[in-house]
Amino acid sequence: MTGTLDQLESTIAARRAADPSTSYVAALFAKGMPKIAQKLGEEAVETVIAAMAGDRRGVTGEAADLLFHLMVLLAEAGVPFADVLAELDRREGTSGLAEKAARPKG
C-alpha cells in the first residue's frame, strides 16, 4: 500500500532542488514552511467540503492533493514518511481514547 507514497516521497526529494520556475514542488520548497502549511490547510478544507457535499470523486481527488501536500510538508520538516508509519504501527491495537490520554500534555 505504501509503494505509491514511497515513490512520491522520492519524487518530492528529487524535485526539491529543481528550478522553482519549472517545478511546483521546488516552488513550494522555495516559499518555505508557511506556504507549504497553507497549501496543506487549503487541501484539507477542500477535502472536507467535497466530503460534506457527498462528492466521492471530489473526495478522491482532494484526498490525493491532501496526501501530496502532507508529503511535501513532511519533507520540509525533515520527517520521513517511515516515521509516520512507525507511529501508526505503535498506536495499532491501542484504544484511541487510551492513546490520546497517554499523550504528553502541553
Curated annotation (Swiss-Prot):
Assigned GO CC terms: cytoplasm
Pfam families, per database record: PRA-PH
Cross-referenced CDD domains: NTP-PPase_HisIE_like (cd11534)
tRNA processing as UniProt keyword: no
Subcellular location: Cytoplasm
Listed pathway(s): Amino-acid biosynthesis; L-histidine biosynthesis; L-histidine from 5-phospho-alpha-D-ribose 1-diphosphate: step 2/9
Domain of life: Bacteria
One BP term from GO: L-histidine biosynthetic process
GO molecular function, one term: phosphoribosyl-ATP diphosphatase activity
KW Metal-binding (keyword) present: no
Catalysed reaction equations from the record: 1-(5-phospho-beta-D-ribosyl)-ATP + H2O = 1-(5-phospho-beta-D-ribosyl)-5'-AMP + diphosphate + H(+)
Sorted UniProt keywords: Amino-acid biosynthesis, ATP-binding, Cytoplasm, Histidine biosynthesis, Hydrolase, Nucleotide-binding
Enzyme Commission designation: 3.6.1.31
NCBIfam families to which the protein is assigned, alphabetical: histidine_hisI, PRK00400.1-3, PRK00400.1-5
Family, as annotated: Belongs to the PRA-PH family.
Designated name of the protein: Phosphoribosyl-ATP pyrophosphatase
Organism field: Rhizorhabdus wittichii (strain DSM 6014 / CCUG 31198 / JCM 15750 / NBRC 105917 / EY 4224 / RW1) (Sphingomonas wittichii)
Organism lineage string: Bacteria, Pseudomonadati, Pseudomonadota, Alphaproteobacteria, Sphingomonadales
